[in-house]
Amino acid sequence: MTEEHVVLLDEQDKPSGTLEKYAAHTLNTPLHLAFSCWLFNEDGQLLVTRRSLSKKAWPGVWTNSVCGHPQQGETTEEAIIRRCRFELGVEITDLTPVYPHFSYRATDPNGIVENEVCPVFAARATSVLQINSEEVMDYQWSEFKSVWKSLLATPWAFSPWMVMQASDEQARERLLNYCQR
């Protein structure tokens, strides 16, 4: 895979340039565009993944299915499909926005800052997973309500963006409705 960049955003969330992904994620991370996707199987179970220990930010932490950054000239939907294939080796369908205006800023234990405008989507897996171990060290298919209980009981075990997304009542309701259809 070629070197990834992030799309930098101005104060109005409009693209203002690009920066190499690893150079962007520092102690002073500029605002940039990202995405987050919650992937469900045909039984309505949620794929929860554990970030590889080689990840720069939040290594070894459990998170929602897949996250990443659209490249310049790429739609968010195209980026989600690309990262699902790269990280999980999976094809998806029924890509649906569930929290289109989510943004957050969080600092990991090593001081690395995430500062993202990060629309949240749900999607359905249509093929068997083929996990890229450089991205994902573990994974589990779980009932959404069970994951929600775990998020409430042990939020420190999960990525802050996952906790924040699921804590939004409207987004949580949309995810629950999505997994039940």
From Swiss-Prot:
What residues bind Mg(2+), as annotated? Answer: E87
**Where would I find the Nudix hydrolase domain in this sequence?**
30-164
Catalytic residues (positions): C67, E116
Provide the primary localization: cytoplasm
The compartments listed are:
Cytoplasm
Would the keyword Isomerase turn up in this protein's UniProt record?
Answer: yes
Task: Name a single GO biological process.
Answer: isoprenoid biosynthetic process
Give an example GO molecular function: isopentenyl-diphosphate delta-isomerase activity
Q: Which reaction does it catalyse?
A: isopentenyl diphosphate = dimethylallyl diphosphate
EC numbers on record: 5.3.3.2
Q: What pathway is it annotated to?
A: Isoprenoid biosynthesis; dimethylallyl diphosphate biosynthesis; dimethylallyl diphosphate from isopentenyl diphosphate: step 1/1
Instruction: Report whether tRNA processing shows up as a keyword of the record.
Output: no
Q: How is the cofactor bound?
A: Binds 1 Mg(2+) ion per subunit. The magnesium ion binds only when substrate is bound.
Family matches, as CDD domains? NUDIX_IPP_Isomerase
| UniProt keyword terms in alphabetical order | Cytoplasm, Isomerase, Isoprene biosynthesis, Magnesium, Manganese, Metal-binding
Where along this sequence does the record place binding of Mn(2+)?
H25, H32, H69, E114, E116
The role this protein plays is: Catalyzes the 1,3-allylic rearrangement of the homoallylic substrate isopentenyl (IPP) to its highly electrophilic allylic isomer, dimethylallyl diphosphate (DMAPP).
What PANTHER family does its record include? ISOPENTENYL-DIPHOSPHATE DELTA-ISOMERASE
What family is reported?
A: Belongs to the IPP isomerase type 1 family.
* Name recorded for this polypeptide: Isopentenyl-diphosphate Delta-isomerase
